[in-house]
Amino acid sequence: MHLSLILQLLVLLTLANGTPVVINRFLGRRLSYPIDGGVRFVDGKPLLGSSKTIRGVLFSVLVTAAGASLAGLEWNVGAVLGSVAMAGDLFSSFLKRRMGLPAGSRATGLDQVPESLFPLLACRHTLSLTALDIAVTVALFFVGEVVLSILFYKFHVRERPY
């Protein structure tokens, strides 16, 4: 198991998934354009929802790429982690809309696993990650994300404690 790499990845996954929340707190709805453009899926429900924005994805990728450089990894690894974490988040949102859950609603597991598992799988060969590295990182991210969400809420960064 690569403990130092797991720590680096946890920091980067937290940056990737936390950046859109922090940016939204500081910028509000300014420069906030929904990725789905307000389109509805064949079921009549929003494709992704208004909280998934181009701004959030772009900032996530840029901040995660910069964070990777600062953490001693290649910037492009950070860009891939950020991009695929956002793809996982969009996948979760798509599934949540199909389940009838509104934007911002909680779906424990679905809110944490794709946005951590997908990027780790995408970088597994580049970073020589083992199945154990991936499993431990996803589990730690899951717990950490739940704790950070509560803290973000307590410090008024997030509107809900999840």
Spans of model-derived segments:
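Interhelical loop and helix-boundary elements at the membrane-water interface
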Residues: 1-80, 86-122, 128-162
